[in-house]
């Protein structure tokens, strides 16, 4: 985990402290992960040889929402998940259809299931419009405008290349855009309060 963070990701979040049997791995400078300039890429988790690190698991929250009759559960499925989900289960491409994911989610109790491609299109349109406006104002003479589609990328730019922050698009990521649309326009269309909608994202990262 230390090596992948230092040598591959170049973030230097982790420190090896102590010697021999007293060796421990801690966040540099005795900080918490929240205080460190971690991009939350997850590489330390996938490379941890002893399983000491793990990702956040919101499965129980989802089960509670599915069991709550007052919650409307709305799920978005990312294109990458749609394309690759069957590999881990040994399905062929022909067997691993998006319909099977949607059917499984509906049988588990999801009220609505959507493909994230819709909000990816919204993000692209928002970014394209912003690019034209910024070009017209002369704000992008020296550098391009960078996408804001990935929260990990945003954190990485802020910590490692703060001079590029002004070059980032202000558009939300497709996942965030989906949540905003579900809690505003969609909630209004189905006659629900935003707080009664439980938005779920099934993402590859």
Q: Where do the PLM segments sit?
A:
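Short cysteine clusters
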Residues: 1, 5, 38-44, 48, ...
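Short N-terminal signal/transit or membrane-insertion segments
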Residues: 4-8, 15, 48, 81, ...
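Non-heme iron-sulfur electron-transfer modules
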Residues: 7-37, 51-73
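Structural motif corresponding to the C-terminal cap of alpha-helices
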Residues: 9, 48, 186-190
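Short loop/turn motifs at secondary-structure junctions
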Residues: 10, 44, 49, 109, ...
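Generic non-transmembrane alpha-helix signal with a bias for helix starts/N-cap capping motifs
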Residues: 31, 41, 98-99
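Ordered, soluble secondary-structure elements with a strong preference for glycine-centered loop motifs
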Residues: 35-39, 95-96
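Iron-sulfur-associated redox domains of electron-transfer enzymes in respiratory
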Residues: 55-204
